[in-house]
From Swiss-Prot:
It comes from Hepatitis B virus genotype G subtype adw2 (isolate United States/sf/1990) (HBV-G). One of its GO terms (cellular component) is T=4 icosahedral viral capsid. Coiled coil: none annotated. Homodimerizes, then multimerizes. Interacts with cytosol exposed regions of viral L glycoprotein present in the reticulum-to-Golgi compartment. Interacts with human FLNB. Phosphorylated form interacts with host importin alpha; this interaction depends on the exposure of the NLS, which itself depends upon genome maturation and/or phosphorylation of the capsid protein. Interacts with host NUP153. This is Capsid protein. Keywords: Capsid protein, Cytoplasmic inwards viral transport, DNA-binding, Host cytoplasm, Host-virus interaction, Microtubular inwards viral transport, Phosphoprotein, Repeat, RNA-binding, T=4 icosahedral capsid protein, Viral penetration into host nucleus, Virion, Virus entry into host cell. Residues 148-195 are annotated as: Disordered. It is found in: Virion; Host cytoplasm.
Length: 195
């Protein structure tokens, strides 16, 4: 998926839809195109897991917003493809347009949907760590890498995310009293659970 240069006098504007989330188009490009499930499967997953929050008028997270936008873009692309299929007389031209939409735009939408669903499901840091791990794995010559690629769903159990900066102080464990959450905390947790 290449970066998009915008028309209408905005040439040279560098848009990367993953930048604000700490990733890049290049980082996602390490994953092969057949890695991403079909748009239909991704839409079914998004609907099954996040339907209520996606349909809500509340702002839940930037990932929910991006997911909504990707879904709306796909709906518009399918509307265009249907229109082209019904109105373009030349079958060869019609097939070229429909195939281009399905192949190129379909891959971009599949990447966007996968990224945001995965961030909502596993957490952004875990997904970024996975992308880096996979990128390192795929660029390592086969003779020097493990036979199996990293798996996102097992990543939190098998890797240690190292953060930059000082290492945290070590403290000896001390017994602590368990405190009940304050009403404010309880309210914020219930709101987060909706999203």
């Amino acid at each position: 998926m290449d970066r998009t240069t915008l028309p209408y006098g905005l040439f040279g504007l560098d848009i990367d839809p993953y930048k604000e989330f700490g990733a890049t188009v290049e980082l996602l490009s390490f994953l092969p195109s057949d890695f991403f499930p079909s748009v239909r499967d991704l839409l079914d997953t998004a609907s099954a897991l996040y339907r209520e929050s996606l349909e809500s008028s509340d702002h839940c997270s930037p990932h929910h917003t991006a997911l909504r936008q990707a879904i709306l873009c796909w709906v518009e692309l399918m509307t265009l493809a249907t229109w082209v299929g019904n109105n373009l007389e030349d079958p060869a031209s019609r097939d070229l347009v429909v195939n281009y939409v399905n192949t190129n735009m379909g891959l971009k939408i599949r990447q966007l949907l996968w990224f945001h669903i995965s961030c909502l499901t596993f957490g952004r840091e875990t997904v970024l760590e996975y992308l880096v791990s996979f990128g390192v794995w795929i660029r390592t010559p086969p003779a020097y890498r493990p036979p199996n690629a990293p798996i996102l769903s097992t990543l939190p159990e098998t890797t240690v995310v190292r953060r930059r900066g000082r290492s945290p102080r070590r403290r000896t464990p001390s017994p602590r009293r368990r405190r009940s959450p304050s009403p404010r905390r309880r309210r914020s947790q219930s709101r987060e659970s909706q999203c």
